[in-house]
Every structure is written in C-alpha cells, then in structure tokens.
C-alpha cells in the first residue's frame, strides 16, 4: 500500500515537472528562433545596403557622397536660417492680412501665405490693403537683401553630415527642407506680388529674378521631392512673369536675364535618385534598430504589418522583421532602377517594380512621369516669354 502510494506520488511529480519543463523548453526554442529571424533580417538588410552603397554611391558613405557633389559656396544653411526667421517673426501690426478670399495673421509668414500662394489673377481681382502691403514690404526689406546675397552663391543643396541621423535629415529640431523651401518661396513671391500690386514693376521684376536665380542653384536635389519642388518653383516664376508681361505691368526686357538661368529639371532625375539612395541608406540605420519579436507566420497571415500601425496588438510580434524584409527588397529594386537611369537620357523610362508594394520604387516611377510633364510646361512657358521678348 505504501509503496503504491509512493509510486503514484512520484508519477505525479514527474508529470508535473514535465508539464513545467515543456513550456519552458518551447519558450527557449521560440526565443532561439526569434533571434535567428531577427539576425537574418538584419544581415539581409545590411547586405542590400552595402551593395547599394558600393554600386550607386561608389563606395562612399551618404555624407561623403552628398558633400562630394557640392562645389563652391553652399547657401543652404543661410536659406534655412532665414526661413526660420520668417517663421518665427512677430506681427507686423494688429489684425489680419486679407486678399483673394484668404485671411492670415498680419505677420511675415501670414502675408507670405496670402500673397505668395494665391495666383496672380485672383490677387488682381481681390487685392490686399495697399498700406498693409507697403508695411510688409518695408518690414522685410533686410530679408530680401539677404536672399539676394544667397542667390549669388554657387549652389543651394542639402547635404548629409557625418554625425547626422535620418531625423536630422528631416530637419531635427529645425525646419525640414520642404519647409525651408516653401517659406523662402512664398516670401519672395509675396514680395514680388506686393510690389507689382502697388505699381512698382521694376522692383517686382528684380524680386522675380532673385527667385529664379535661387532655383537655378538648386541643381543637386537630395530626393525626388526636392527636384519636384524645383520644377514647381520654376514653373510658378515663369507663369507669373508671363502674366505680368501680358498685362503690361513690367516690360519683357526687364526679365531678359530670366531666360538665361538653368531651368532644367528632367535631366536632374538621376541626380535626385542617387541623392535619395544616400538618404535611404541613412534611414537603414534606424530600420536596423526597429524592435521586434517574431510571431508564428501562420498565426495571422492576413495582417498588414507596419511599424507605424499599432491597430493590431499582434503587429508588435512581426512588424520589425517584416519591415526590414520589405526594406531590403525595396533597397535592391530601387538601386537597380537608379543604375538603369544613368545610361538613359530624357524622357526616362523607369521599369515597373517587380514586387507589389515597393513604395520607393513606385515613387521613382511616378516622379519620372511627373517631372517630364513639368519640364514640358516649363519649356513651353519659357518659349512664349522668349517670343514676347523678341518683339
């Protein structure tokens, strides 16, 4: 009896230990598998990044590559500081600034949004208060002179520094490149439109020429977005000049210098694509560190894992690895597309991405189409201006 009881107790202890050991063993196996998956995804991403760096950037780091493209004096930092000053400037006076059914605070930035963003025909139909326009022009004269000096630099280009992270590339604690661009463009267009509205055509023409010079210097874009904004800015300047000449507000001869500036945008697509490659390699450092755990692939095969989507609680188990895997495929495809561009001439043909969802590759394909249509428009308006100047 005693022996039977002792044997039963031992069996219970044995199975209890087995019951405790199996989950622990499974946890160890899953953790080991998890670490293998993480290490594998990081190794694949490293390989794709290194191949892109060697094949596209000639073996240089993103900082070395972007800095090597800039020759002479670079006016970007001066432009950024001026944009920050415009952004943070106090009110010029009380109340608001209104024109063309638009209203903003009576600050340099507010006036820039009204006079710089609205198209000329609308401003002409519904002009702002002339006295407030004069106050704005007087209050911002020093900034205008600074932009005139910046336009005499050799180039305006954002570069990557040795200690930069991807967050620094996006602006860090300062303005992003796009914000710098928009604030300076809106500001100068606002001053040009302001002078034209109060009848000072000669100064308006000088302001327009300064904007055109600034855009002619933005010939080393760091991404397709920067190339697109260059094209948009040049198009805006040319169309505004055409309006003024046709209306007789300024003489075509006053803008003769305008047509001598470098207005090529489409030929810069390979330059922008290589710059984008440099920024994506910098971004890879952040992707490498994305925290993740692995969940069994069959657990939720239907979910779209994204590091930016916390809607599904199980995303946290797979999103890091899947994101790295997607980024690896994207880098390889994008690098191949960039290299294909180097042997072409406009209009460029960008092959379709061979895997659905490769956003960076799709962006390059869309950029090639968009930039081509913008270049056609720029060339057409420029040709029309040349005809008016020849009369």
Where do the PLM segments sit?
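Short acidic linear motifs
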Residues: 2-391
């Amino acid at each position: 009896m005693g022996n039977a009881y002792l044997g039963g107790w031992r069996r219970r202890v044995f199975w209890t230990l087995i019951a405790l050991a199996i989950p622990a063993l499974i946890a160890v196996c899953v953790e080991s598998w998890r670490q293998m998956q993480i290490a594998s995804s990081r190794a694949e991403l490293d390989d794709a990044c290194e191949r892109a760096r060697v094949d596209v950037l000639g073996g240089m780091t993103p900082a070395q590559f972007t800095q090597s493209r800039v020759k002479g004096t670079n006016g970007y930092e001066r432009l950024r500081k001026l944009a920050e000053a415009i952004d943070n400037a106090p009110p010029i006076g009380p109340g608001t600034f209104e024109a063309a059914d638009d209203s903003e605070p009576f600050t340099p930035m507010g006036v820039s949004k009204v006079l710089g963003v609205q198209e000329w025909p609308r401003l002409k139909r519904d002009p702002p208060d002339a006295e407030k326009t004069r106050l704005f022009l007087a209050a911002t004269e020093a900034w205008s002179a600074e932009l005139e000096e910046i336009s005499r630099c050799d180039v305006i280009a954002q570069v990557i520094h040795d200690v930069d992270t991807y967050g620094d590339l996006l602006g860090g604690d300062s303005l992003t490149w796009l914000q710098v661009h928009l604030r300076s463009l809106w500001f100068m267009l606002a001053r040009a439109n302001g002078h034209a509205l109060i009848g000072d055509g000669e100064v308006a023409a000088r302001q327009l020429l300064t904007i055109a010079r600034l855009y002619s210097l933005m010939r080393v874009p760091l991404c397709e977005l920067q190339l697109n904004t260059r094209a948009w800015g040049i198009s805006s300047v040319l169309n505004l000049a055409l309006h003024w000449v046709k209306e007789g507000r300024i003489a075509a001869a006053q803008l003769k210098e305008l047509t001598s500036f470098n207005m090529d945008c489409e030929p810069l697509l390979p330059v922008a694509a290589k710059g984008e490659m440099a920024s994506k390699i910098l971004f890879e450092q952040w992707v490498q560190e994305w925290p993740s755990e692995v969940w069994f692939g069959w657990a939720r095969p239907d979910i779209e894992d994204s590091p930016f989507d916390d809607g599904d609680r199980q995303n946290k188990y797979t999103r890091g690895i899947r994101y790295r895997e997607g980024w690896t495929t994207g880098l390889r495809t994008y690098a191949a597309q960039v290299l294909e561009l180097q042997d072409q001439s406009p209009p460029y043909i960008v092959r379709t991405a061979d895997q659905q969802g490769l956003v960076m590759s799709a962006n390059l394909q869309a950029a090639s189409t968009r930039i081509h249509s913008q270049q056609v428009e720029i060339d057409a308006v420029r040709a029309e201006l040349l005809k008016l100047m020849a009369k």
